[in-house]
Amino acid sequence: MCIRDRLYDVRGPVVDEAARMEEDGMEILKLNIGNPYPFGFSAPQEVILDMLSNVRTSQGYSDSKGIFSARKAIMQYSQLKKLPNVTMSDIYTGNGVSELINLCMQALLNNGDEILIPSPDYPLWTATATLAGGNVVHYICDEQSDWYPDMDDIRSKITDRTKAIVIINPNNPTGAVYPKEVLEQIVQIAREHELIIFSDEIYDRLVMDGYEHTSIASLAPDLFCVTFSGLSKSHMIAGFRIGWMILSGAKNKAKGYIEGLNMLSSMRLCSNVPAQSIVQTALGGYQSVNEYIQPGGRIYEQRDYIYKALTDIPGITAVKPRAAFYIFPKIDTEKFNIMDDEQFALDFLHEKQVLLVPGKGFNWGQPDHFRVVYLPNVRQLEKATDRLREFLSTYHQR
């Protein structure tokens, strides 16, 4: 498999061009990546102090799955989320969720095996599955239904080579939160076809508007599920690189796969130990993220601002996100003659020095969407949307 053929446009060609422009002295307004710290967010003070106090005792390797205190705290968190049949040995820490997704795909997929991944998706899923030799089959999430998965589309794409289904809930890039009824339908499909369920839940503590997050594994005690989460987003420490995955449910149906996971986990020795040392404090302490996602909080108010500002621009529509810090607007391709969304993003970057990610970067099949990160403060978001309005007032792709 040729690595250069794999798309990962969150850090792709448009981002490369922005970096070149910065080297030439231009100031770029970046709305392309969910990295909280550069936008003025920081970890709770007790988390920082806890890491500093543990550095001296964190200089050696840990168990390949992680230190006891971290896994114990994660197990307790899994109990709060009602994940069934979880023991300490079912918990793996990683250098972010990204490392663990890659590990899972390497252990699962042989050449020609198929895996169902949403469209739009977080592109790491498609890239790692393809690099592992699998065939990615994208199922549609329906914008007209609040970006929920299209069950008929899922069913139509299952074959005898389908091994698993991936869900991203809360969703990146759409900000959707799947209700229990939607998750139950996915569980039923997985049950009928004996599919493994992979659930990416890194934004489960960033849910707004009274919505509740349900872990799909809690609805599937008879199925083998792998649930991913971590501290990068909820605790604003993406650079610390600490995530985890939890195996639950019918582990007896996946003994060979679990052996493969254990082998690959041992091969990378362990995840970084200083970051593991803060998990207990982070999960058990004051959850400062709650201040951000309530009315008056930064993420909540910035979400409201970006939604209104974008949908006030002629030719732009959007579904209001309910979680995370992304919005995935639709652009009228006929109005602006857009045939290539990457070219649209490059044109906007060149003319207005604002960096967005085109929809193709999330394996969306039409050139009619782009993702905006609403982590910048309202003043910066206002600047970005004013520039977009000005740009689109005369734009006609050539």
Describe the function of each predicted region.
Residues 107-129:
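Conserved PLP-anchoring active-site segment centered on the Schiff-base-forming lysine
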Residues 218-297, 307-309, 392:
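Conserved core segment of the aminotransferase class I/II
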Residues 80, 155-156, 337-339, 347-356, ...:
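PLP-dependent enzyme catalytic core of the Aspartate aminotransferase-like
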Residues 137, 142-213:
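Active-site phosphate-binding strand-loop segment of PLP-dependent enzymes
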Residues 280, 296-307, 318-332, 366:
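Conserved glycine-rich beta-strand-loop-beta hairpin in the small C-terminal domain of fold type I
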Residues 4-96, 103, 270, 282-286, ...:
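N-terminal small-domain helix-loop-helix segment of the aminotransferase-like
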